[in-house]
């Protein structure tokens, strides 16, 4: 075992991450909506939003992670980090999202995103799916009860910082390629 990992501890995931945290949006309230088609596979950012009347669905804030819970969207890598809302703004989206939120002082929001997008976690989520063919969904309760090893908060922030810098470079290259193509 790596000597740095000696400081890691085991937790039930729901003890260190909030699942679908409660937020308030009134029926009919106009808010930013992120439909499933705006989550790009294996891309941290959200490519856009619609202004729509809230009629239901998952609710989230900046810093939350959205993960598709239905096939084939999960297998296709539809997971994103919310950062396009204004301060204290609540957005909403598909009922087919699981929303993950860090717990202040315990987990780092960007580390939560990278943890949820890790092949290890995604594989567990995919294997937990149940339902009829073509309409299978992740069993959220199984994820909530999953025992995970996590580093201390300071190390989570360091890990997320390194991975975030790599994602920033990928996004910059994507923008350069888009400009060259146009």
What do the PLM-derived regions correspond to, one by one?
Residues 57-58, 62-118, 131:
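A short beta-sheet element
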